[in-house]
């Protein structure tokens, strides 16, 4: 089992978005998705890295046609158990790096709200974005989430007192950028890195 499968097999992804701070994330994200949907009904939506289906299921219940792609079998199992009786959602096992099962410009909206957390080099990050762009209609919307370095530094290292642990494990650069590998699970980025990937 790889690091990601092992992590999510033992992590309560359902509980994360149900927590107080998780609700802020969920409601804020849904507000922007609804802004993109506008007055029109029945959008075709792809969620890449759908987790246990919190966004995908809610959007399907609102009448949209949803394809939900999830990498980890544990989360996919949970999502599949929750969609019984919902006919306008289709789940898939797969990776954000390969969306070849989907045609070009197939979706009005593509959500990439988790995969970038687990991409550890620029080549993979660019590939995820290229695939999302390819499957999204020219006038469509793509939503992408990242783990931001500075927020993590403030919350995890300073507030939680973990800075010396990171220093001792050589997980910080001289300018306090978190160094991540696959075993660390999450890749922290700065705005300038996102800008460089998007260039």
Where on the chain are the PLM-derived regions?
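Conserved class I S-adenosyl-L-methionine
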Residues: 1-40, 42-49, 54, 58, 141-170
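Class I SAM-dependent methyltransferase SAM/SAH-binding core
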Residues: 54-98
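A short acidic, Gly/Pro-enriched loop at the edge of an enzyme's catalytic core
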Residues: 100-110
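A short SAM/SAH-binding and catalytic strip from SAM-dependent methyltransferases
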Residues: 109-123
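A short glycine-rich, Lys/Arg-flanked "PGG" loop and its adjoining helix->strand segment in the class I
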Residues: 126-138
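Short alpha-helix
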Residues: 182-199
């Amino acid at each position: 089992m790889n690091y990601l499968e092992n992590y999510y097999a033992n992590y309560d992804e359902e509980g994360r978005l149900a927590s107080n701070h998780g609700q802020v994330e969920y409601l804020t994200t849904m507000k922007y998705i609804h802004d993109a949907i506008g007055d029109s009904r029945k959008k075709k939506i792809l969620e890449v890295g759908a987790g246990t289906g919190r966004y995908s299921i809610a959007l399907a219940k609102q009448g949209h046609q949803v394809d939900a792609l999830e990498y980890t079998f544990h989360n996919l199992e949970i999502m599949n158990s929750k969609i019984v009786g919902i006919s306008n959602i289709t789940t898939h096992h797969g990776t954000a790096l390969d969306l070849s099962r989907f045609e070009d410009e197939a979706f009005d909206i593509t959500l990439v709200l988790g995969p970038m957390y687990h991409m550890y080099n620029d080549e993979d990050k660019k590939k995820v974005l290229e695939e999302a762009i390819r499957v999204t209609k020219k006038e469509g919307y793509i939503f992408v989430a990242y783990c931001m370095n500075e927020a993590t530094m403030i919350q995890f290292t300073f507030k939680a007192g973990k800075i010396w642990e990171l220093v001792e494990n050589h997980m910080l650069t001289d300018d306090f950028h978190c160094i991540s590998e696959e075993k660390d699970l999450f890749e922290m980025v700065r705005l300038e890195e996102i800008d460089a990937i998007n260039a």
